[in-house]
């Protein structure tokens, strides 16, 4: 059964630090074709580094998408989802507009893990920042405590 978002005026914003989020945007559009979308890819500053840098660049992108009329922004970037999402949700959104939303990709990805794991072992290939955050193992073990998780940082991502 297809779930619909509550009334979301304006387009849905999708952000990534590069082009990878376009695959996520395509899937979102398949599931929710009735919405308009704005994609923001920050190729100029790709390969974000420290928490502070990831948070600041992600916050800037979210604010830009809000300024463009989006009331929902999806962080299609694992690094931004791992390192900046919670801070933006807890610290920034209440001061901007509590009715707006920012969502990440880690939790929805993890919800699919049980369906795809045939041997109770999942490998995660991601940026060093995403691997160091341990966001995937933490979320996977909340839903699937029996699944073993191995993470490998890919330095060129």
Where are these regions (language model features)?
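Non-catalytic structural scaffold of enzyme domains
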Residues: 1-157
